[in-house]
């Protein structure tokens, strides 16, 4: 039984929670292809992206960000081959299956399981500030092969609109504001989460 006291941090729009020391678990991480949360917000009418595309993008961004921190991972194609016949249920249920399998057969010391809750691009070519891009995703690190929950983080960012102005001032503010895409926001989140993991080694 793990007895490490939970510890929370909040930085770069990331809320992170530690449940046990995670340093040794980062020796070789298996990254599970992200899930779309059951409450996924991705309506195309609202600037959203289909869940299968959103999860693919975030999985790739998080994987690349973790690799950039010098953390060894189980190659994505190797992981996919090992579990291609395992039906996916939910992130929480499958975490135990992946932790045991990746630990016993792929040499993983942990598995990172993620869910995308929102992946929405800005709407409106001239006034995107009314409907800005917004991304929310969360990850959980489990020890392998035992499946103990070690660490979790949630990234949540919606680009704020420029200050309220009127007339020509509003036009100038819109020109000065760089309207982020969902992809750019997700990239920032992936890098922030990878940075927190690297700091915990």
Task: Give residue ranges: language-model regions.
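Sec-dependent bacterial lipoprotein signal peptides
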Residues: 1-5
